[in-house]
Amino acid sequence: MKIHYRVKKNTIEIIRCYGTDSRVVLPEEINGLPVVSAAPYAFSAHKDGEEDAETWESEEAFSFGEERLLAGEEVQEIVFPDTLKEIGRYIFYGCKKLERLEFSDTLMQVGTGAFTGCSGLKELVIHQKK
């Protein structure tokens, strides 16, 4: 999996994800910095343009096929790390096939309209931070 991100105050904000699997598991750290937020529209196919970003690639990633943007109808499950504190507005906008989300009780802020168009969401797992 490939992740586009930006550094904000010595923390990481996820901007976009690319891969071959419809299941996204985000890391707790990138280059030694904690992943604490996911940008507005990060998993939405409706996002206009791309922002300046750095790229991180999973070391254990070995995939068959061409990587694609994991957004909109391309994503079915997202597992956020225990370090995540905030998800941006309209982050899942139009993710009709998104069925499962997992995050911990450290998530403190959910942006406006985050679940707009998530008609297939069946399971929301919230666990206590380890």
Question: What role is predicted for each listed range?
Answer:
Residues 1-10, 18-36, 48-86, 96-109, ...:
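Structural signature of tandem-repeat unit edges
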Residues 41-42, 88-91, 111-116:
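Consensus positions within tandem repeat domains that build extended binding/scaffold surfaces
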